[in-house]
Amino acid sequence: MAKIHMVLQGKGGVGKSMIAATIAQYKAGKGQKPLCIDTDPVNATFEGYKALNVRRLNIMDGDDINTRNFDALVEMIASAEGDVIIDNGASSFVPLSHYLISNQVPALLQDMGHELVVHTVVTGGQALVDTVSGFAQLASQFPAECLFVVWLNPYWGPIEHEGKGFEQLKAYTANKGRVSAIIQIPALKEETYGRDFAEMLQDRRTFDEALADSALTIMTRQRLKIVKTQLFAQLENAAVL
């Protein structure tokens, strides 16, 4: 059974492509060859990772789903031998979610012997409320055969609202049964770990590419190695992956 990992969140610039790239690198490190697809109609960030062989497929036509291209996406999934990782843009979040649900795509994938895993992001700072409600919306609308992984991204601040952490928020407690795993992206010290990781992401480089680059200082590579270890250890513990 292949797992179809789809990164969905209606807020832009919250780390969706980073998550898709991290999953792809984790899978590759296990000797797997996931099919990576970037469907973001505006920012093809995931496609920028040359080492991951990401295919670009624009599933939007204006504000609507391009059904012919979406059909092509389903065909790609159907013929995939391993897992599939799909990065999706904020602008296509609403139409894509509606299209997946109204066309009963999660059930279709299950009938093919595949499993749909939706990865969504919750961030601290100004986007906290929007990203939490985006998660709640997905969890309440998607059918039971769909699994969820929530990534907590503290880049813009701690993930808490009125003194409550994510796991105490109503959006989570009401949908707890839907969540297979919570991945905590490390809170990185801005001037060291944070800068190193941000530069690696801006360059669309994988951890392995950065760690093999002798032009980077020894300590920069050491810090990136620690971030990689922290992320991959959590993915290792997430049974859904």
Curated annotation (Swiss-Prot):
**Keywords assigned:** Conjugation, Plasmid
Cross-referenced Gene3D superfamilies, in alphabetical order?
A: P-loop containing nucleotide triphosphate hydrolases
Entry keyword Chloroplast? no
Looking at the keywords, is Ribosomal protein present? Answer: no
**Highest taxon of the source?**
Bacteria
The UniProt entry's sequence similarity note says: To plasmid IncP-alpha RP4 TraL.
User: NCBIfam families, from UniProt?
Assistant: PRK13886.1
**Record protein name field:** Protein TraL
Organism of provenance: Escherichia coli
